[in-house]
Curated annotation (Swiss-Prot):
NCBIfam families: eIF-2B_rel (TIGR00524), PRK05720.1 (NF004326), salvage_mtnA (TIGR00512). It comes from Trypanosoma cruzi (strain CL Brener). Its main location: cytoplasm. It comes from the Eukaryota. Belongs to the eIF-2B alpha/beta/delta subunits family. MtnA subfamily. The record marks 174 as: Transition state stabilizer. Keywords: Amino-acid biosynthesis, Cytoplasm, Isomerase, Methionine biosynthesis, Nucleus. Catalyzes the interconversion of methylthioribose-1-phosphate (MTR-1-P) into methylthioribulose-1-phosphate (MTRu-1-P). GO terms for biological process: L-methionine salvage from methylthioadenosine. The lineage of its organism: Eukaryota, Discoba, Euglenozoa, Kinetoplastea, Metakinetoplastina. It is an enzyme of class 5 (isomerase). This is Methylthioribose-1-phosphate isomerase 2. One of its GO terms (cellular component) is cytoplasm. Its EC number is 5.3.1.23.
Length: 372
């Protein structure tokens, strides 16, 4: 029997004029919400990965800019003391926040569109323009929730039909659930839907070093809803696929290029290579805002690299646990590129499942985007 949707987990707490974001670095040991008051607050929250997950970053950014403008409006000599000053503040805020993290396309696409919409708003007062921005941001929020629901529904239905088993076992990486989006999730949203319908045997979650989003966040979400979950270390994926019945690999995405090449959490390509070897269908689940027809392929994607201490220091104690020496170099890319040829199952969006062609180009992202 299908279960009702459960939306008890949330990383974004918003009401007009106020925004609080869950500091996901502290989960699962602490549940701490940070109040976001300024543009600097949201830039730092994104940069420091207090908020993470491409959809959640984009939604939080839009809401935060509206909240920051409202707070600026309250200042006697603030930047929002005129219509022109407010518009300038909003546009410059979008530009600033876009620089926080470069790889996820949702952030830049969302804020570029928000800038266009703000430029088109006709307002007689600064307060009217701030209110219009809040309405635009709230629309972005609501649309992401609707995207989550569409991805869940289409993905679960497609997998059920493909696998033709009463229950499905799925492997995933990172965290792509309610904590990474506005409500239910993308790849983990599909897992949720399978669970709600009584069709999930097991979800296997990679720990996802170095931030352990799988161990800390995905497992946390599964435990909260009693979703059957098995945690594995990242290096166990090939052994898992070779020894246990894995019906599909489902991952999220931070950017899907015009040819279908996909930027996602580091380690995703490892899963795709292993899945191809063992004949396991590999799916990418993401909202259509993650589709990027302007970027030709994975070679054109800027891959974010983070601080070396994420690899050399214990996250719990902040003490160095790796030897130091002049011959040592540290490489810490946050994302990798999965070639479109390895996305063998298809791309799941809120519009349906885009299945690959038999030969290159395997996906026509431009056609999908232009059809919207």
């Amino acid at each position: 029997m299908a279960r009702a949707h459960n939306a008890t987990l949330e990383s974004i707490q918003y009401a007009r004029g106020t925004l609080r974001l869950l500091d996901q670095r502290k989960l699962p040991l602490e549940t701490v919400f940070d109040e976001i008051l300024t543009v600097d607050d949201i830039w730092t929250a994104i940069k420091e990965m207090r908020v993470r997950g491409a959809p959640a970053i984009a939604v939080s950014a839009a809401l935060a800019i509206a909240v920051a403008a409202g707070n600026e409006l309250k200042k006697k000599d603030g930047a929002c003391n005129s219509v022109d000053g407010t518009r300038r503040f909003l546009l410059e805020s979008c530009d600033t926040v876009m620089t926080a993290r470069p790889t996820a396309v949702n952030l830049s696409k969302t804020l570029i569109q928000l800038k266009r919409d703000i430029a088109d708003v006709t307002a007689n007062t600064a307060g009217g323009l701030v209110e219009a921005c809040a309405v635009l941001a709230e629309k972005i929020y609501a649309e992401d929730v609707a995207c989550n629901e569409g991805i869940m529904r289409h993905g679960a239905a497609h997998l059920t039909q493909l696998v033709k088993k009463s229950k499905v076992s799925v492997l995933t990486i990172c965290n792509t659930g309610a904590l990474a989006t506005s409500r239910y999730g993308t790849a983990l949203g599909v897992v949720r839907q399978l669970f709600y319908e009584g069709k999930l045997e097991q979800v296997y979650a990679c720990e996802t070093r170095p931030w352990n989003q799988g161990a800390r966040l995905t497992v946390y979400e599964c435990v909260q809803e009693n979703i059957p979950c098995t945690l594995i270390c990242d290096s166990a994926v090939s052994a898992l696929m070779g020894s246990r019945p894995i019906d599909a690999v489902i991952v999220g995405a931070d950017r899907i290029c015009r040819n279908g090449d996909t930027a996602n959490k580091i380690g995703t390509c490892n899963l795709a290579v292993a899945a191809a070897h063992y004949g396991v269908p590999f799916f990418v689940a993401a909202p259509s805002t993650t589709l990027d027809p302007m970027t030709a392929d994975g070679e054109s994607v800027v891959i974010e690299e983070r601080e070396t201490m994420e690899l050399t220091h214990s996250m719990a104690t902040q003490q160095r646990v790796v030897a130091e020496g002049p011959s040592l170099r540290i490489w810490n890319p946050v994302f990798d590129i999965t070639p479109a040829a390895l996305v063998t199952g298809g791309i799941i969006t809120e519009r349906g499942v885009l299945q690959p062609s038999a030969t290159a180009p395997f996906f026509d992202i431009t056609r999908i985007v232009s059809a919207s």
